[in-house]
Swiss-Prot record:
NCBIfam families: lysidine_TilS_C, lysidine_TilS_N
Nucleotide-binding as UniProt keyword: yes
Protein name: tRNA(Ile)-lysidine synthase
GO cellular component, one term: cytoplasm
GO molecular function terms attached to this record: ATP binding; tRNA(Ile)-lysidine synthase activity
Compartments (UniProt record): Cytoplasm
The enzyme's E.C. designation: 6.3.4.19
InterPro entries: Lysidine-tRNA-synth_C, Rossmann-like_a/b/a_fold, TilS/TtcA_N, tRNA_Ile_lys_synt, tRNA_Ile_lys_synt_N, tRNA_Ile_lys_synt_subst-bd
Cross-referenced CDD domains: TilS_N
Length: 471
């Protein structure tokens, strides 16, 4: 069998990898992320060489402004590279160090954020469907090790995907190792830039690349490729688990109008811990928009809250995300200002009475007996001879009591709230209806014995509350 040249061997692998993962379609416009280093220079040349795809390439370079004149020389080199292939060139300068300080990020994380924002902008501006990145199999092994050292679950350890972000970001060189890329560059006679920061072992990735990976290579010469294969296997498992999580999400999680999520505690407790943790992360993402700054400790704290015998509790997560346990519900939402206490309102007769904080109280004179079997918790009837106007609407105060309908003894309103599972943060906003010192109705919870309708009642009022959350 004829041995393929380094160039032909690389092109054959990339073609097969593209066929397997569907990264490119003939005629696609593709933004190529080019730093000027060996891998990205090889990427441009490889994509140009895939003649059968007729790709419409745009070279994009972000100047990180971290290495002074050397950063500017990198930019000029990439521009000349684009000119060599007669490709459009787009660049932008970004003060990554200032961004890192402002956002309290590491230089690595700030640089990554700036690059992806830039690539997104370029793709949108030129109408590109795809952004091609130059990560290869050795990068994959390094990423897996880095995340393993920092601590990660299955999703993190599956590392980089050949096709990510819904098909937007593709990594055609994951099929290749560093040595194959270097042999390709040498065979093609391609020059590239050397970034001295890549040798700085102050960065974790560089320590892994220059110290840990060579050590593992001495233990097993194929360690890097096997680590990359492990990441691929984990990614396959993760795809299956993600499908199971999505199915559980539809069954167990209710998405709120405000963009948060509510889950049943009893339902969560019946699920395996691994699935619970994934559901928590999904619920946080619904409320927050992403999972940035969410750690294992946060997710573990939520699980303890769900499993606790205490029926209520709350957790404050980064970026104003609040997780609240209230009896059999756990809610994930962006924290809002505390709900204010209800302002006092005097009711002197029938009409629509707006309530502070939203909603209204509707008072009507009744002409017939109550439809006892059809009354909702937002409606109550009163004997006007026993409780004539004016009435007072106000919020709950510690010490408030009432005689509930059908009982002879008093009960604390706080205990009524607990029985009805009213969240603690809502209690001071629940309307209480008084006639003098007598509490007639804890709206949405319990009616009082005072002024109840009897067979002998002649003058009656029906009161309804509308447009207000009561539980």
């Amino acid at each position: 069998m004829k041995t393929l040249s380094p160039v032909d061997a690389v092109l054959k692998k990339v073609r097969a990898f593209n066929a397997e993962h569907g990264m490119f379609r003939p005629g696609d416009r593709v933004v190529v992320a080019v730093s000027g280093g060996a891998d990205s220079v090889a990427l441009v040349d490889i994509l140009v060489s895939l003649n059968e795809l007729r790709l419409d390439l745009v070279v994009a370079h972000l100047n990180h402004k971290l290495r002074g004149a050397a950063s500017d020389e990198d930019e000029r080199f990439v521009e000349q590279c684009a000119q060599t292939y007669a490709l459009p060139f787009v660049s932008r300068g970004e003060q990554v160090k200032a961004l890192a300080e402002w956002e309290r990020l590491s230089l690595e994380d700030a640089g990554r954020r700036a690059r992806y924002a830039f690539f997104d902008d370029v793709a949108a501006a030129c109408g590109a469907r795809t952004v091609a990145l130059a990560h290869h199999a050795d990068d994959q092994a390094e990423t897996l090790l880095m995340r393993l050292v920092r601590g990660a679950g299955g999703l993190g350890l599956s590392a980089m995907q050949p096709v990510g972000a819904g098909g937007k970001y593709v990594r055609p060189l994951l099929a290749l190792g560093r040595q194959e890329i270097e042999a390709y560059l040498d065979a093609r006679g391609l020059a590239f830039r050397q970034d001295q920061s890549n040798t700085d072992v102050a960065f974790l990735r560089n320590r892994i690349r220059h110290e840990l990976v060579p050590y593992l290579g001495r233990l097993n010469p194929g360690a890097a490729s096997r680590l990359a294969r492990t990441a691929e296997l984990l990614a396959d498992d993760e795809a299956l688990l993600s499908r199971l999580v999505e199915e559980a999400l539809r069954r167990h999680v209710m998405v709120t109008e405000q963009g948060g999520a509510i889950c049943s505690v009893d339902t969560l407790r019946r699920e395996p811990r691994g699935l619970r943790r994934r559901l928590y992360r999904k619920a946080i993402a619904l409320a927050k928009g992403d999972l940035a700054r969410i750690s294992f400790d946060h997710v573990d704290a939520i699980d303890r809250l769900v499993l606790s015998e205490n029926p209520s509790g709350r957790l404050h997560l980064p970026e104003e995300i609040l997780v609240t346990r209230s009896y059999n519900e756990v809610a994930f939402a962006r924290r809002m200002a505390d709900i204010p206490s209800l302002q006092e309102l005097w009711i002197d007769g029938p009409g629509c009475w707006p309530l502070s904080g939203g909603g209204e109280l509707v008072v009507e004179i009744a002409t017939g007996p109550p439809p006892w079997g059809e009354l909702s918790t937002t409606e109550s009837w009163f004997d006007l001879e026993l409780a004539p106007f004016p009435w007072l609407i106000r919020g709950w105060r510690p010490g408030d009591r009432m005689i509930p309908l059908g009982m002879t003894g008093e009960k604390k309103v706080k205990d009524i709230f607990i029985d009805q599972k009213v969240p603690r943060e809502l209690r001071r906003s629940i309307p209480l209806l008084f006639r003098g010192d007598s509490l007639l109705w804890v709206c949405g919870c319990r009616r009082g014995e005072s002024a109840r309708i009897t067979a002998g009642s002649r003058a009656m009022a029906v009161v309804r509350i509308r447009g207000r959350r009561l539980k």
